[in-house]
Amino acid sequence: MQSKKLFLEVIGKLKDEEFEDLFSSLLSSSEMKDISRRLMAAKLLHKSTTYEEVQDIMGMGSNTVNKIYFKTKGSPILRKLFGRD
């Protein structure tokens, strides 16, 4: 749990333009791509795109889409972020 606390502390101190630098320093391009794709899938699900459509659009399996849905449904922060579109 110390690592999670450190992560949240560091994130809280960052200015907007520093996020990309931090994540580029810590994550491989593959990890960045995976996170970006999961975020896009969560957004599509938030916009009521069907599981099957998300699978086709994102090239993800049903288990991955299902996991993303259940981990993100009802998330206040995602509602706030995705509700702006």
Predicted features and spans:
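Recognition helices and adjacent regulatory flanks at domain boundaries
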Residues: K15-D16, G83
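Short, Lys/Arg-enriched anionic-surface-contact patches
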Residues: E17-R37
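Short alpha-helical "recognition helix" segments of helix-turn-helix
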Residues: E53-M58
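Helix-turn-helix DNA-binding helix
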Residues: V65-N66
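Short, solvent-exposed alpha-helical "recognition" segments
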Residues: Y69-G83
